[in-house]
Amino acid sequence: MKNWTAEQMRAITSRGNALLVSAAAGAGKTSVLVERVLSRVLTDTPPVDIDRLLVVTFTEAAAGEMKERLGTELLKRLNEDPGNSRILEQLELLPVADISTLHSFCHKIIRKYGRVCGYETKFAILEGPRETYLKNKVLEEILEERYEKGDRELFALLEYLNDEKNDRNLKELILNLYHFSRSNPEPEKWLLDSLNLFNGNWERFEDTFWYREIKSSTEMWLEYILELLGRAKSVAEKYGQARAFSLLAEDMEKVRGLYAKLNEGYEAAKQYLSQVKFGTFSWGRGVGGKDEAKDLRDKAKEQFETIKKRYFSWEAGNFREELRTLTSYLDPLVKLVREFSRKYQEEKRKHGFADFSDLEHWALDILKSGVYRELREKYVEILVDEYQDINGLQEEILTYVSRDGQNLFMVGDVKQSIYRFRWARPEIFLKKYEDFTDEKKIELSLNFRSREEIIATVNFIFKQIMKKRVAELSYDEKAFLKKGADYLPNANCFAELHLIEGKPEEDINSNGEPEEDLTAVHREARLVAAKILKLKEEGFKVFDRETKEFRPLQYRDIVILSRSLSNSSNIWQEELTRAGIPVYVEGAGSFLNSKEILLMTSFLKVIDNPCQDVPLAAVLCSPVAGLTYEELWQVRKEYPEGLLYDALKNKSLGKDELSVKSQKFLELLVEFQKLSRQISLAELVNEIYRKTNLPEIFGAYPGGEVRQANLKLLHDLAVDFAEINGGGIYNFLTFLSQAAESEDFSPAKLIGEADDVVRVMSVHKSKGLEFPVVFVVGLGKRFKFDYSNTVFLHSDLGFGPKFFDPEKRIRRHSIASQILSERMRRETLAEEMRILYVALTRAREKLILVGTVKNLAKKMAGWQSQTEALKDTLSDGQIARAGNFLDWIGPVVFREGSDLPDCLKVEVHPQQEKIEGEQWELPEVLRVKLLTKTPFTEETDYTGQFRAGLEFNYPGLKIAKLPAKMSVSDLKEVFSTDDVISLEDEDEVFLPGVYFEDGAMLGIVYHEFLRRIDFQGDLSASGLKAQGETLVAEGVLPPESREMLDFTKIARIFATPLGQRILRAREIYPEFPFTLGVKAGEIYPEATGFSEKILVRGVIDLLALEEDGFFIVDWKTDRVTGDILNERLKEYAGQLNLYARAVEEITGKKVKEKYLYFINLEKEVRV
């Protein structure tokens, strides 16, 4: 018999009312759930049959495990009491017991009762790639129909969303709004109620949720300001500065005064803010501490000013009018969502599909029809696992099935709620936790998973940062993890924090976006690899729970967790493999980027249209055609002009060996082209496999089984595609890219728990798992805060649209968007903190934290300066200002007076330090460029070029497949001045497509700032900085932009001849949008002679009008020089020519000149 703790026993045996069990990580909640079911069916008086219990789990795997464990326990007890008929009865009932996911339970309700209520009972579940594709298809059809009708509301909405280039923002907004509404019990009502919030029907603004949010946020920031001033006052006291001490005390009183005014109302607070003046700071000459105290006070004053600009810059009397004005955009948006919902349902019904959301909504409708009474009678108790991840719709279903919630047994841990992006509502759990009496809630805080050192580290960090106002819950004594596992002592099981100093500046790509700090990703990977090898070499041992003995560490005992692997999975794979460590990287991105799938997609493109040079080159230099790079060069050299396909046909006319190879490939291509018109796409894929032997060839590669499984998955996706679309290679390739982006998409996986490999996975993938040794990496990577949204969405607060003046083309925060963006930022931070908690609590015996920090010494000094004023925790403001995990962990570990536990060791790796394994060179990354007539030499190293060729996505399409709309940026390759391809070695090392998650904002931030400059204002560096501060306060720019924008370099623009011309111009049009019809043949040579046009949308950075015509300026943030800059200029020339043509056609005036201005290079280039 297991020795249950008192709280576990209470969770097993308590009866008579609803019960909420808050089970900390590693608390054994599954065992408790199993035992509660067993006690219900075997020992209750009277006992309950197992088919009269409803057990709801989060995943099918969890449901299967639950049934298996119940079966094992029942058999075990039957062996102990062979004649027990009660146990036999429950074993017989177990297969039909309702132990399933909520979706499976809803499906069962529909199958049993649906026909009576008018619902189809036979349908296929639509999920993953097929669901994504069908949604996009329906949405595209709706918008195309409106484009054709010239829908004015749609065009106004596109202008409002700054979507003139393309309608990507609108599509994303419609789908997000659709999903938001569907997570509610009544989607239509939620949409209309959210819209009605903008009718301005309130008596006092102070009675609205808008003001409640303003008041709550302001109070949080006031606490932070007081903490800063308190620290400055402590410095003044330390250095005996009585005048400064007195002044800071006055400052604090002025700040506290705002608390009272907030209670009086909006206008009272606004008036008070306008009257507050801070005195002049003074400090004794030659006395230390001045800079520290002044810096703290300046930060406090800056934050106080931000409160004024962020929340109290509006006129309360204008709120109603402004919000009502915004309905002119929200109303057509809601109409589009409702139309999409209706037509998407029709499309699903036509194909015989239902998605998971349908299951829940249909089941709820059926329950409401009266069926709930029968089910309430049937189920004695409903047990819900992972209750923290429930949403509003699911809660409603459970309420109906249960006896108004009175026979619900709910288990979860709100600290592990990390699925808000899937509409989870942790606040449902939190509200019950706050409302329930002690008799109705139980804390399971004993952790049976982790060593004491890990528990101490987790408690040490989270007791200081997890606070109710900023994290939605408090990490108090009740939440503390407590040791429940008995491990034998091991002196090497302390937790570790490794801080790597990152390089100070990022490389900039052609879109003005910083490339991801390769040094950071690679150095973290190398440090981890070196640490793994060291653990192995030193004979690190882990405790084996089966044998109850220590054994040597194996690779399968190790996991590497990252918040996201979207841009770094390949790096981890390469670096660990290079170190000789067997590794498996989880993630969908690796599917489309795998060699075998890249080759197949390239081949399909060539079959569809061979006039695509890059895919054709990739196929030719693959096992399909078998050409070497030397031979490819020979083909092109003999026919240097025109398409590579024409060059290949020309070569096939000869008699030499290369000509024979070319001829055989062309024959194979023609055969597949004929087959593509006669058989299904899935059959075509099969034929390609059969005739080329690609599965066998890739089976011989390293990881061959996974590669073969990927090829099979590609075939399966072709089958799926056929069910929702008649076919077509181009459409299938679109479907494939959407499939990889789907949250539910899983690439081929051929790995089990017994495989001795290190696993690399996202924190979300690790939920519910545990490992002896856990590395948590990327702690310095910035959180994602999307400030660029024009409309923010929130499940409780509804819409948060920005205000837009169509005449001045100015967007700024409305009261609604300001409040929602702030609320969403806080909720994002709370979720990120829970993600960190999940990551740290996966470890059983060894926890190693790794992060990269720029300006490490300065950062550490900042962390250390946060002194005793912080007391036991960081302030709410300090926590709320975090941009990454290290912004929490750093101050916790380094601040003065921090009681760092002995079980946590910190190691710092400066920029100049060579990390063990640093002698490995960075993998050479080659660029695919449009072909120049570069001499070919035997010495040239073409390592990696085959892959680079496969990765390139070239937009050559048949006329039948031409897009109806495209953006100017889509045309970059089309307008390039070179016309053939090259796989040319470059000295520079770049990794295309890999960006800082925060760095991707840099180009956007520069453009947002430059389009909003007051050209009549102060254009000095300080003046521009002040303009930037205003835009940050208004929410137009993110706070991070303070560090991202170089105001000195921007100021220098206006000292140049070009800048002076801009200032003297008669008219200046920042961000000038245009739409231009272009004949398809001008973009795609294969369309020459056709009358079809393509609608091209774009935005010109700056258009200036002088007496004799216009000139154009395009801002660039590239940091490249020399040959690479010349290549970029060729790419940009076509875009600028199109800009000029658009302006001339629209205005009838001549465009005299076109300029590129490279801000970081401080260089203007006339094109």
Swiss-Prot record:
UniProt-listed InterPro entries: AddA, DNA_helicase_UvrD-like_C, DNA_helicase_UvrD/REP, P-loop_NTPase, PDDEXK-like_dom_sf, PDDEXK_AddAB-type, Restrct_endonuc-II-like, UvrD-like_ATP-bd
Family matches, as Gene3D superfamilies: 3.90.320.10, P-loop containing nucleotide triphosphate hydrolases (3.40.50.300)
GO CC term, one of those recorded: DNA helicase complex
Lineage: superkingdom: Bacteria
Cofactor names: Mg(2+)
UniProt keyword terms in alphabetical order: ATP-binding, DNA damage, DNA repair, DNA-binding, Exonuclease, Helicase, Hydrolase, Isomerase, Nuclease, Nucleotide-binding
Protein name (Swiss-Prot/TrEMBL): ATP-dependent helicase/nuclease subunit A
Organism whose genome encodes this protein: Carboxydothermus hydrogenoformans (strain ATCC BAA-161 / DSM 6008 / Z-2901)
